[in-house]
């Protein structure tokens, strides 16, 4: 006992001295920590769902648990397991905690899984302890990953509780950024508000408890799950200096604590952070990442998550400035509409991502949401040398979530192109589009092929293709793709530019009667994902969308400013070309302007067709005509071109807005609060439903359709494949 107190006194004395100048013990600890921060190759994040959704058919033993996602990592290129003991929502954990809430309940919905946590606790252990011991026994590190504001509990409703919604949030709704009735525009209402000292203190205590009670090598503070930390930001603002400083002081406090614990146990605890890869974006969200690096509060920065904003060189340069290792974060792709021939989740794609990241100068790679611990690429991507002789795929875009989902105007920070089947680019005759593609440093040693997937284009000669200024010829059509050989000596390490131009429009399927490009006959409810590209870009409130008498009944029963039930379509139109929109509907109710309407934005101008019980109006042009819109269905035909807009009702011209289509679609004051980061749809989209927050409205819709003289085809995807001269077997 005497020896113990002497040790505690020595540590306390050294820490007191640290306030004036670091002691030799602390300097040694920091030097060891700095050295350790540069030793790993691959960090593998395990989200903890192996315990939360444990297969009922398996025995409740540590060994059976480890076989799910950990055992196969031994001997691979993975050097560190970062284990997340759920932390969803804030305060829920599957490790043994006295401060948080132990999550032992089963998650309803599957008879094939159950929560293993209670079984392991009865056996004197828990998921984090089991994984930590396994990692150390197999020569790997173990970090504990805390999701700093996970909102997988966002499906919670007061009348329908969600199992991941913690008691803390139910007991302290004042800790939350919003409420079920007052949802923010950016992020989830169930996020906790880090502007509050009480929330920051809880986060600190959760982290401190693990550092004191588990023999972990480091902690991962996952700020990407999820990027909502301040009420001011979630409701459309930017973080203030005071708010940022509050979170920064939390980081400082965590660093001090890890050094205290490190001195007590004689071994440092590393701090890693998972954050956006652009410091300015993170700054506005409330995370002063550059300050944390400058002050020495973090040891490793892992960049990107739902989106990558900049090429890796941007974050690498920041790391070098502050002497902090930088890791490229590889999240699993979630792109919809991919073709099975060339996919972002393939082994070849992970190789390409790694090759490119190493070429950019990263210090390591971080793997997120990969559930197969035996995945082949985990034994291939740990070094550039291991990757060099292997086939690869290079996509311009891997993840396509919107930065504006968490920060108003956040899309402006995106310089990495967003080109996916669900985010196509328009190809037109006479105008080339340039697609940047980032490629690793080994592509020149074998063969390279450019693969292009363009809607209805089956003739390779229909496209004029140049890569870094070199014309690509001799293309072939292969399984819905156009393949063009790319001379290896014309492939550059790093940024490459592919230019595509239509020589002529392809033969297209016969248009719908009337020449309509897109037609939604409202005899069914659109369902995700088959509905795409139609989207509902509003927070669910008191609204109804259902079939009634063969028509779509869409009703806004809420007076919340953000309650705007609608369907929107990202049409490809040009303001200088004629666009015709037609809708057939019967008004049921409208007690305010725009409670039932069509919104038409062509990239230059925006206008509403406002349907009221006794009139139809062009909102901005202030043109109106009397009409009983409730007794029967009417067909409204809107024609737009340049600055002209006209409306016909049941085939007869009713409103003439010649020269009055002039309200700018680019000015944010004319924008609606579209969610999920799609605020840019305000500039160019077709929208029907409600655009009035305070008002209530409902209508029966029979059809919505449009045709345009703008002629283009969709560039749906693009990828570069590289193959070495020889392909050796992968080694572990």
Predicted regions and their residues:
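Extracellular glycan-recognition surfaces and repeat-rich motifs
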Residues: 516-517, 521-557
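Beta-strand-rich ligand-recognition modules
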Residues: 454-512, 621-633, 657-680, 711
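Active-site-adjacent "subsite" loops/lids of carbohydrate-active enzymes
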Residues: 35-59, 111-133, 143-209, 213, ...
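Catalytic domains of carbohydrate-active enzymes, especially glycoside hydrolases
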Residues: 64-91, 213-218, 297-303, 359-364
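Ligand-recognition surfaces built from glycine- and aromatic
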Residues: 514-518, 661-732
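Secretory/extracellular carbohydrate-interaction modules
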Residues: 548-620, 708
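Short tryptophan-centered beta-strand motifs in secreted/extracellular beta-sheet-rich domains
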Residues: 142, 581-583, 632-640, 645-649
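Active-site neighborhood of glycoside hydrolase catalytic domains
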Residues: 198-323, 349
């Amino acid at each position: 006992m005497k020896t113990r107190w002497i040790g505690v006194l020595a540590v306390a004395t050294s820490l007191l001295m640290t306030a004036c100048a670091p002691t030799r013990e602390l300097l040694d600890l920091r030097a060891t920590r700095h050295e350790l921060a540069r030793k790993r190759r691959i960090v593998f994040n395990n989200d903890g769902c192996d315990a939360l959704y444990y297969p009922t058919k398996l025995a409740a033993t540590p060994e059976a648990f480890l076989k799910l996602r950990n055992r196969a990592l031994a001997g691979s290129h993975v050097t560190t397991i970062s284990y997340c003991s759920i932390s969803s929502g804030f305060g829920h954990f599957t490790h043994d905690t006295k401060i948080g809430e132990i999550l032992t309940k089963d998650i309803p919905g599957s008879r094939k899984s159950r929560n293993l946590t209670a079984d392991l606790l009865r056996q004197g252990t828990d998921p984090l302890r089991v994984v930590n011991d396994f990692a150390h026994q197999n020569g790997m590190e173990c970090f504990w990953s805390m999701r700093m504001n996970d909102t997988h509990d966002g499906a919670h409703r007061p009348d329908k509780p969600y199992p991941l919604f913690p008691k803390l949030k139910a007991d302290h709704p004042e800790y939350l950024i919003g409420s079920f009735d007052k949802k923010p525009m950016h992020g989830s209402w169930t996020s906790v508000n880090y502007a509050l000292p009480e929330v920051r203190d809880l986060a600190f205590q959760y982290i401190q408890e693990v550092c004191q009670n588990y023999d972990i090598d480091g902690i991962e503070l996952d700020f990407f799950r999820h990027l909502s930390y301040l009420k001011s930001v979630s409701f459309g603002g930017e973080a203030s200096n005071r708010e940022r400083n509050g979170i920064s002081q939390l980081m400082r406090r965590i660093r001090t604590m890890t050094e205290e614990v490190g001195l007590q146990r004689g071994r440092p605890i590393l701090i890693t952070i998972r954050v956006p890869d652009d410091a300015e974006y993170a700054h506005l969200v409330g995370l002063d990442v550059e300050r944390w690096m400058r002050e020495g509060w973090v040891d490793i920065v892992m960049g990107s998550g739902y989106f990558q904003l900049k090429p890796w060189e941007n974050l690498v340069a920041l790391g070098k400035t502050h002497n902090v290792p930088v890791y490229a974060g590889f999240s699993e792709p979630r792109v919809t509409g991919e073709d099975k021939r060339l996919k972002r989740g393939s082994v070849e794609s992970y190789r390409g991502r790694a090759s490119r990241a190493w070429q950019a100068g990263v210090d390591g790679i971080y793997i997120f949401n990969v559930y197969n611990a035996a995945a082949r690429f985990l034994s291939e991507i740990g070094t550039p040398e291991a990757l060099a002789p292997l086939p690869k795929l290079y996509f311009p875009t891997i993840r396509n979530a919107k930065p504006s989902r968490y920060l108003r105007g956040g899309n402006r920070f995106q310089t990495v192109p967003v080109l996916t089947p669900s985010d196509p680019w328009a190809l037109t005759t006479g105008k080339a589009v340039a697609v940047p593609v980032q490629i690793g440093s080994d592509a020149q040693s074998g063969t390279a092929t450019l693969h292009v997937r363009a809607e209805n284009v089956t003739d390779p000669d229909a496209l004029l293709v140049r890569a870094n200024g070199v014309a690509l010829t001799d293309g072939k059509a292969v399984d819905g793709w156009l393949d063009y050989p790319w001379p290896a000596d014309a492939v550059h390490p790093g940024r490459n530019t592919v230019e595509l131009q239509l020589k002529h429009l392809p033969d297209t399927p016969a248009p719908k009667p009337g020449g309509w490009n897109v037609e939604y006959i409202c005899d069914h409810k659109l369902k995700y994902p088959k509905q795409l590209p139609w989207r509902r870009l509003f927070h669910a409130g008191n609204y109804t969308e259902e079939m009634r008498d063969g028509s779509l009944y869409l009703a806004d029963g809420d007076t919340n400013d953000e309650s705007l039930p609608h369907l929107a379509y990202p049409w490809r139109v040009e303001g200088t070309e004629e666009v015709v929109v037609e809708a057939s509907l019967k008004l049921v109710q409208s007690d305010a302007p725009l409670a039932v309407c069509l919104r038409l934005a062509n990239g230059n101008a925006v206008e509403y067709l406002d349907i009221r019980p006794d009139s139809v109006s062009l909102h901005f042009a202030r043109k109106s005509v009397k009409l009983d819109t409730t007794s029967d269905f009417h067909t409204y035909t809107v024609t737009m071109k340049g600055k002209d807009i006209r409306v016909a009702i049941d085939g007869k011209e009713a409103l003439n807005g010649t020269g009055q289509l002039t309200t700018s679609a680019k000015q944010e004051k004319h924008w609606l609060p579209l969610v999920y980061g799609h605020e840019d749809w305000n500039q160019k989209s077709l929208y029907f439903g409600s655009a009035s927050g305070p008002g209530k409205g409902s209508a029966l819709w029979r059809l919505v359709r449009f045709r345009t003289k703008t002629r283009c085809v969709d560039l749906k995807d693009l990828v570069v494949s590289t193959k070495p001269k020889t392909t050796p077997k992968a080694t572990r």
